[in-house]
Amino acid sequence: VNGGGGGGAGGFLTASGYSATIQSYTITVGAGAIARGGTSGVGNSGGNSSIVPASGTSIIAIGGGAGGGASAGTTGGSGGGASYGTHSAAAGTVGQGNAGGAGGGNQPYWAGAGGGGAGAVGTTTSTTDSTNYYRDGNTSGTTAGIHIFAGGGGAGGDSGIESVGGLGGGGRGSRGGGGQSFTSGTANTGGGGGGNGAVTAGS
């Protein structure tokens, strides 16, 4: 049987009118989570990324939700996937991510993967050359202009349905033992798809 995939770490958020003052700030960079096997093995949610001032308003990018096995996936920056015929995929947090992918296949425990990390999902700019301002691992991410770090969507398990991702995220995940290949994010457009679900021995 397949357990759920882990969620991605919390990513980049946008804010307007935030006042930064001279004081101590605690900055946490969240970590991506691991998958978990077993019939009811819900994966782990991704860690939040945050900036927390000693006094004032915190900024928290919520980690991606875990994928579910026979259980439902958990809501996060992007929602987790869930197994086909048992539970639907979890929704993403409003303003922080997209829904996870649904599971699929011929068995009820082929789970969906975890959701991608939080990001500026669905954000657009008025700049006609805005494509060059997405962080994609090449020099466009260091040029002057508006930079948008888009979060990925959750992937589907086996023959499941992939979710809509954050400006290049999303994609169909494969189950650990084979099945459909995953779809990665598109260059110059942001995050990739959610990670794949796990498979335990004998499944």
PLM regions: where:
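Low-complexity, glycine/proline-biased repetitive segments and flexible coils/loops
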Residues: 1-203
